[in-house]
Amino acid sequence: MSPCGYYSKWRNRDRPEYRRNLRFRRFFSSIHPNAAAGSGFNGPGVFITSVTGVWLCFLCIFSMFVTAVVSVSPSSFYESLQVEPTQSEDITRSAHLGDGDEIREAIHKSQDAETKPTFYVCPPPTGSTIVRLEPPRTCPDYHLGKNFTEGIAVVYKENIAAYKFKATVYYKDVIVSTAWAGSSYTQITNRYADRVPIPVSEITDTIDKFGKCSSKATYVRNNHKVEAFNEDKNPQDMPLIASKYNSVGSKAWHTTNDTYMVAGTPGTYRTGTSVNCIIEEVEARSIFPYDSFGLSTGDIIYMSPFFGLRDGAYREHSNYAMDRFHQFEGYRQRDLDTRALLEPAARNFLVTPHLTVGWNWKPKRTEVCSLVKWREVEDVVRDEYAHNFRFTMKTLSTTFISETNEFNLNQIHLSQCVKEEARAIINRIYTTRYNSSHVRTGDIQTYLARGGFVVVFQPLLSNSLARLYLQELVRENTNHSPQKHPTRNTRSRRSVPVELRANRTITTTSSVEFAMLQFTYDHIQEHVNEMLARISSSWCQLQNRERALWSGLFPINPSALASTILDQRVKARILGDVISVSNCPELGSDTRIILQNSMRVSGSTTRCYSRPLISIVSLNGSGTVEGQLGTDNELIMSRDLLEPCVANHKRYFLFGHHYVYYEDYRYVREIAVHDVGMISTYVDLNLTLLKDREFMPLQVYTRDELRDTGLLDYSEIQRRNQMHSLRFYDIDKVVQYDSGTAIMQGMAQFFQGLGTAGQAVGHVVLGATGALLSTVHGFTTFLSNPFGALAVGLLVLAGLVAAFFAYRYVLKLKTSPMKALYPLTTKGLKQLPEGMDPFAEKPNATDTPIEEIGDSQNTEPSVNSGFDPDKFREAQEMIKYMTLVSAAERQESKARKKNKTSALLTSRLTGLALRNRRGYSRVRTENVTGV
């Protein structure tokens, strides 16, 4: 007998030999003639002498596999398989791997990094466990249709905007200024400004009749009647002129541009009064409940703009006495720009403490509405869901929810404008878009939606559906007797009584995001529900069809189908109309599988095995079981799968995570799984994706509407207040006040009161005074110049210094005139020793002179003489005569200037007296001691 050949392989991912091709090795045994050496076999060889021995071994261990589940660890298989590559194989491998083969090999390794394979042992089913296929199911039929209604809708919201109208403000601007007049300046010490209302009689008889206004203002302050006159002059009617600046929507007229002020004589207070008649056309605003209105001037009138004396308007709110209010029917106001009269109208006038306001009266119900249109929607779908109506508006990406009962608009105060306006809009849309394709079904319907929105809805029906309904109605009328009438509950939904509440108001949210989110949710819900319904129905139908396929394929391969259905590895067999199944346990970790490299039957040249032969070796020494490799790593505990040997035999079998290739019933090589092309039996599920829906930025209330919610427009008020001075007064005009002019005017008025003679004297006095004032003005102007002031300051400083030195000189003349007149002569007197008498006689001529006393270092020559009493008396006489000479010269000089005889005569006599002066003796010119 020829030896039996075995092929074995160790699985070890850490060794490089694992991925390489196997080489053939054969070893011969005396038992089996076709034995082959297993490459890398590391255990004791197991030799089976004959086929009978295989069956005996199988019967010995079969009971163990049937009663207990033997599991094989994935690692045990690879531990029992090992390939020792030869040198030629390494050379071949290196020849096939180029620069890019390393990357390919790394990719293959990453693809082969899978879980370790599991081998199953499937015993033949004995019929102890039988199953059957479930009969076909009845697939559900989902009806997603709802009661949809097409239509046109107009959505209304709460009107938060103020009611605006034109009003005219009449007042007189009274300014009383008190000024103090200084010598060269004018100072305002007090200023009083007030607004005075213009009487209605002056408005009707002067302003709107002649376009003029009086310069007199009469008003009440502190419970006293006060009068003011422009420029403190007699009153007169002054023409109204347009203001220089006007704001948007506002015009104004006034009588003067100047503010009158009087500057009196220096040191006096004067008061001046100016009265400016001002008429302003302003914007007035009133908000719900319209019990007051505000003006763009900042004033608030606590009276309804709809207050009047007719049509029940006297019931409107008012906080003023009736004598302050006047209403004129057919009143014609004058346009102060064109001087033309306007159309007759009902004119209201109200006199307040500071102004008079006038406006045209109009009925309340025709002017204001508590609701305002928000959106016009041409295509709306209404459906009933959970006892509510849903209005889906795709153009706005919103869904509004309301009750199924209609809403009575009469419950809302001042909502009379809604139906008329909505009807006109719906008629326009229907005429332009749906006139040829749809018909109207009933009248317009109103619903109160969540969030405070009122939906005015017009149901529509396509022409095709209308024809079907008409045919159905004709058929019903033919089949029923004419005595029968429709029951009253056909319109019970609309006939539900609604409790009316008078003066009801609604509050609309400032955001519509909730409606947009509702629309998005409904859109997603509709799409998902429809998709799931279709999938469920299709899935059920597919299962019924697959059931028929399962039933037909079970006789062909019951084990594969049963394993797929039961989601576990089983062995199955058809037993009539039922299926017998048995469980396929996994091999344990103490088992090793050996794959043989030959598929030929020993001793036969025509019979071969159709599946590879394997040997299951237990590592715990319990024995070896021979079998065949089944499909999907199934281990068959028999070798009954035979076939006639054929030429050019080529087979691929899955063994673990790889395919083994047999050619002519002999093992050739191992092939990786990823090297075998794959075809898929799966069908992709093509579902419709959810459509994109973008949220549109919708504003319930615009910025202008939000700005108009208040009673006053503060921006307009600030604009008006800042322009007030520019509009009615000339801020660029400067009036120069001169105190000298004031003095001259006062003196002129005084002399004019004295008559003709006084005027003549006044001209002379005013001329002299004018010259004096001009001189003073020139001097003050020079001083006002910075350089002039600096020069004057320097001169004053120099004068002060000169005065200081002059004062010292005069003081010196008074205290010691000789020292002041003869400082050098008297210098030696300062050098006399203390206690020495300057008038004492010198003892001898050799004594130290006076000039040398106390100064021994003086190198100048000294006068060697002492005090001489005679010389002292002579000096006194000389001083007297010098005084007389000076006086005579002054007298003679004055006489020459005046050319008068008396003065000359006096001068001559004085000279003669001096010449004939007794006691005069000639002064000696030589020194007494002699030099």
UniProtKB/Swiss-Prot annotation:
Question: Which regions span the lipid bilayer?
Answer: 787-807
Localization: Virion membrane; Host cell membrane; Host endosome membrane; Host Golgi apparatus membrane
One GO biological-process annotation of the entry reads:
symbiont entry into host cell
Topological domain ranges for the Intravirion compartment: 808-931
Name the glycosylated positions.
147, 257, 435, 503, 620, 686
Q: Where is this site: Cleavage?
A: 494-495
Which cysteine residues pair off into disulfide bonds?
A: 122-584, 139-540, 213-277, 369-417, 608-645
Q: Does the keyword Ligase apply?
A: no
**Region Involved in fusion and/or binding to host membrane: which residues?**
179-185, 264-271
**What positions does the record give for the motif labelled Golgi targeting?**
881-884
What post-translational modification does the entry describe?
Answer: A proteolytic cleavage by host furin generates two subunits that remain linked by disulfide bonds.
Residues forming the motif Internalization motif are: 920-923
Q: Where is the signal peptide?
A: 1-71
According to the record, the residues making up region (Hydrophobic membrane proximal region) are: 731-784, 764-784
How does the protein's chain sit in the membrane according to the entry?
Single-pass type I membrane protein
Q: Name one GO cellular component term.
A: viral envelope
Q: How does it assemble?
A: Homotrimer; disulfide-linked. Binds to heparan sulfate proteoglycans. Interacts with gH/gL heterodimer.
Function (record text): Envelope glycoprotein that forms spikes at the surface of virion envelope. Essential for the initial attachment to heparan sulfate moieties of the host cell surface proteoglycans. Involved in fusion of viral and cellular membranes leading to virus entry into the host cell. Following initial binding to its host receptors, membrane fusion is mediated by the fusion machinery composed at least of gB and the heterodimer gH/gL. May be involved in the fusion between the virion envelope and the outer nuclear membrane during virion egress.
Stated family = Belongs to the herpesviridae glycoprotein B family.
Protein name, entry field:
Envelope glycoprotein B
